[in-house]
Amino acid sequence: MLKNKILFLLIGIYLVEAILGYHIGWSIYQYDELRLLQFPLALYALLIFTKKIEYSIFTQIIFFLIGVLTATQLTNYNIFQFQELWSAITLLFILSALTSELRNVGNIEHGIALIIVAAFIPCLFILISIINFILYKQWFDWQFNSGTIRIYDSVIVPIFFFLIFLKNRNYPYFHYFYPIAIFFFALAWFFDGARSALLAVMTGLLVFFIYTRKNRNLVLQTCGYIFLAFLVYKSTIYFADKNTMTAMRTGTSMRAEMWKFVFEQWKEKPWTGVGGGYLAEIQYKYGHHIHNLYLRLIFEWGIVGCIFLIWMIYQVVRLFIDKSVLPIAKAGVTAILIDAMFSGSMVYPASQMACILFLAFAVSQRQQSKEYFKYSCGVTKILISLWGALFLYITIMYLGQDLTCWGCASYVGRMAPNFWFYGGTEHLIPATQIP
């Protein structure tokens, strides 16, 4: 029934809106608006679905410990750390509620198909850009929300594996749609130079190839479509006679430099870390985040980040050894984990929600262990209430003015997104007040 999948539908609408570049005007920039829209989604998850959520004993202990350690440091946090903490709590609430919802509902294929088609539509405009590139040797933006090309690249990584899922389910007409969509998704990654997304997808396909025999022909066909896109990409550059874009770049995109810089700062305070949003706070010249989820947890959050990382590893291992989880779900999770190692997929709001949707889809297939029922669900409710109180406290005290500011925008620092579109921004301000 419709009422049993409301959160899934809301997230589907959120992603379609993000992909097609539509925004309602809550903020001047769509990126900032997508961040603001995460609040009602998280609040809905907290208020409506928490009564259905049960955490294992291990999860209860981990988040109780993280909560205690976080509480001892709250008075030392600045606005950037509160932004990062708020974002983490928001995503975990949505992930927990969505996992519970998907575990109890059946058919979600239609909603997934809508998201896939929405992601496919902007890719069609690559053809126009290719023609212009050949004729004028100038590349024109083809995305509907091209504030930064990397955002869209990470959004379609989990959507790529949803596409394979529907192909396996013999979803109507996807037999014809599948090769075209794969080709255009790959074309988007090649022209954007999205090495992280390409590595993530190919690794995910390798995992899918290993885990399932009956779909190995499908994997090889998919690789063929990707290779065809690569040939079109290289041919375009050849005919344009101007190699201005290439996925095979020799530069590092300053990833290694950022990692080394933050590592040197972290060595001075390894237990507490340098603080969430550290690069945004100091206006680091190469970017406002280090493009690596795992190093970010360790270097920025210290012991708290390490504990959370242990919990993540535990959940991933349990997911992969669970035979009830579909191979395509394991492949998609692998791709998300790889992409998070080199990109901002778990920083940008649209890619965050796309990844959370796929993770919830995968985790919802897991067979629940008996450890979930050893203790009363009252322990889980108390834990959620405490984290919910912290979530509301941060929202009111540190993000209240942003949520209540209609038509505002970020403006501080470079247009290198982090929590806000301009990553160095502490709070949104009315557009008329932007210098």
Regions from the PLM with identified roles:
Residues 4, 303-334:
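Hydrophobic transmembrane alpha-helices and their immediate junctions
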